[in-house]
């Protein structure tokens, strides 16, 4: 599958594998006719979804820990959240406030051999949560969602060392398709 977007934004670090697997998962569970509210500002993956025929609206960069009005006021049939919930102090509130009946969400998994990601220059580019699968599943269950499909994958790097070897076979991303109970 060819991804038709500007990869220069990633300065040589474009997440080809993650975008390909996310796109395939979305296509398997969400018909193109369903409208989507994508949590987070417009980004290269928004463009991938639009080029596949999805009608996508993004949130506007508001702090979803404090202001969930975009979620509450949306009439979208599906909410997507690709690597969003790890940035929130309380993803519970957002998940509870979603009115849509379908959710596709992915999160980075906690790696036992690496600390949680934290940008030193961008306060919003930090992971408060890096989930274990059971934690994310429980969060979804507690907020009224039933997981219908799930998938995990690795994120190998081209670096040399012990941790890069572990990344070859340790799952890094977890994606789910869920429906409201």
PLM feature spans:
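Conserved N-terminal segment of class I S-adenosyl-L-methionine
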Residues: 1-78, 92-99, 126-138, 148-181
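Active-site flanking residues adjacent to catalytic metal/cofactor-binding acidic residues
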Residues: 37, 82, 105
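Flexible loop residues that form catalytic
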Residues: 84, 108, 153-155
